[in-house]
């Protein structure tokens, strides 16, 4: 276990330490650990969870958690956002988010670890063939806060894809997704699958292709890829769901909206694709 310290300045008044923790979306198991170890101090003094927090206080959190063990790897990282708790990069297509086997040494998370000088904490994943915003946390508490926002849909991700020009202007794809037979990689729409909903809108189009904005209500594996293929408009270059090959799969994580850990401010991270041919 590694010791972590979180110091938050200029905290607004709160009826109790517990209310403050809940407002920060700190998971209950972290709250329990902080309470048991007296790891919460307000203006330098320990306060019980029921005690009020004065205005403009400095709150320090001390806790222990495992440190990720992914080894750092040298390589360029295209950083699109960074603050004290979070880092977002523009992941290139063709790079894995994290290693799946021992030989996977050059991954996005390994390069981020090299840049930070410490391992990063994963909050979500992108398929190897998908480019765009990949957000990590610099500490386990911020990771837990972002994961909770993603799970409760208070954080939102927007994608851009390139498909055949004939796709309708907009639509909602509400179709359950499950494994394709015994294939461990591929998914398909099937009645016994998990619920999956994708909204799409055409942004622009030319004679050959349409640029489509996509918002997910659910987060199934390959959801966008499977849903677009299901309605007859697979992503251009998709190696699993489009029989026509391309130079890359034209799917990009374009935008992410969330609440910053330990701050009331909404954060919007944007990273438009630069190589889509529309």
What do these predicted regions represent?
Residues 1-278:
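RNA pseudouridine synthases
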